[in-house]
Curated annotation (Swiss-Prot):
Catalyzes the reversible conversion of 3-phosphohydroxypyruvate to phosphoserine and of 3-hydroxy-2-oxo-4-phosphonooxybutanoate to phosphohydroxythreonine. The lineage of its organism: Bacteria, Pseudomonadati, Pseudomonadota, Gammaproteobacteria, Lysobacterales. It is found in: Cytoplasm. HAMAP family: SerC_aminotrans_5. It catalyses: O-phospho-L-serine + 2-oxoglutarate = 3-phosphooxypyruvate + L-glutamate; 4-(phosphooxy)-L-threonine + 2-oxoglutarate = (R)-3-hydroxy-2-oxo-4-phosphooxybutanoate + L-glutamate. Its main location: cytoplasm. This is Phosphoserine aminotransferase. It is an enzyme of class 2 (transferase). Its EC number is 2.6.1.52. Homodimer. It comes from Stenotrophomonas maltophilia (strain R551-3). Pfam families: Aminotran_5.
Length: 361
């Protein structure tokens, strides 16, 4: 069987070796006579899987001991609602930097619980660049500052960590976590849905500085309280064990491949290929994002008209290049180049782009 190159923004492509290992272990995990999906989350077998996954993630991202790591059901949008509940008092101000669709979603979720101050936004220019740091209007008494590290739809990415002083910085890293070295200590909280760089859909990773858990936050049930999840090692309720197991396999794969430093090199090479093809097309393909803000993970681009966009997607699919249709918010084309996308995938896309332009340009 020949696998296609899957450029989906999420759920995204997974390493073939991980999928094959999961396939081989599906019926009989490590000689136990049972599948991992059948095992109790509190049994010794799965507890070992969970402990290894946390240890491997800590090693992969160099997470300090004074940060808790959680594996929780759901995705990043759920955490966007839980973050103000846990880290801000009722009605307290929280600063939000909006650089795209998901930053705007975070504002909507938080607005139910806190006084949201949109400290900066690039919406006026269509999210084609990052909000200029000099224009940020931060609140000295804010509970936290929130930003989205990489916007999958608009294709913009923060590469430098902004200094927020004594106010904790909270960041949604769903689409760029583990794609390059990350200084965890610059953040109060890092959160990410797993389905782009860390594993399958259905599980989220939280990295929380322990002192922030001392905040009383707002009245909430235990299931919405990060302190309760930390106290129970992410097993306050039955976790998505299969997703956790698969994420653990992805962590091991990344470590074996050389860790985040190696993936930073690979991701830079893939992005350079695709942006090079766009910029060298004489305008047939165009990316509208300011060069300094361009995402390495998600590259949106457009052809001269919508009819050509649709033809590009259809012909690419026939050529074994999947899920290149842009998000409905912006249209066009989008190529997602997460860690599990090999260089050969970017090369195949660039070759197809050249051929398509020759035939339709």
């Amino acid at each position: 069987m020949t696998r296609a190159f899957n450029f989906s923004a999420g759920p995204a492509t997974l390493p073939e070796s991980v999928l094959r290992q999961a396939q081989a272990e599906m019926l009989d995990w490590h000689g136990s006579g049972a599948s991992i999906v059948e095992m109790s989350h509190r049994g010794a077998e799965f507890m070992s899987v969970a402990a290894e996954a946390e240890a491997d993630l800590r090693r992969l991202l160099d997470i300090p001991e004074d940060y808790a790591v959680l594996f929780l059901s759901g995705g990043a949008t759920t955490q966007q609602a839980l973050i103000p509940l846990n880290f801000a008092a009722p009605g307290q101000r929280a600063d939000y930097v909006v650089s795209g669709h998901w930053g705007k979603t975070a504002v909507k979720q938080a607005g139910v619980y806190v006084d949201v101050n949109i400290a900066a936004s690039s919406e006026a220019n269509g999210y084609r660049e990052l909000p200029a740091r000099a224009d940020w209007q931060l609140s000295p008494d804010a509970a936290y500052v929130h930003l989205t590290a990489n916007e999958t739809i608009h294709g913009v990415e923060f590469r430098d960590v902004p200094d927020t002083g004594n106010v904790p910085l909270i960041a949604d890293f769903s689409s760029s976590i583990a794609s390059e070295p990350l200084d965890v200590r610059r953040y109060g909280v890092i959160y990410a849905g797993a389905q782009k760089n860390l594993g399958p859909v259905g599980i989220a990773v939280m990295i929380i500085r322990l002192d922030l858990l001392e905040r009383s936050g707002q009245p909430r049930a235990d299931i919405f309280d990060y302190r309760s999840h930390v106290a129970r090692d992410s097993m306050l309720n039955t976790p998505p064990t299969w997703n956790w197991y698969l994420a653990g396999l992805v962590f091991k794969w990344m470590l074996a491949e050389g860790g985040v430093a190696e993936f930073a090199k690979r991701n830079a090479a893939k992005a350079a290929l695709v942006y090079g093809a766009i910029d060298g097309s004489g305008g047939f393909y165009r990316n509208e994002v300011a060069h300094a803000a361009r995402s390495r993970m998600n590259i949106p681009f457009f052809l001269p008209d919508a009819e050509l966009d649709a033809r590009f997607v259809a012909e690419a699919k026939a050529a074994g290049l999947l899920a290149l249709k842009g998000h409905k918010v912006v249209g066009g084309i989008r190529a997602s180049l997460y860690n599990a996308m090999p260089l050969a995938g970017a090369e195949a896309l660039v070759a197809f782009m050249a051929d398509f332009q020759q035939r339709h340009g």
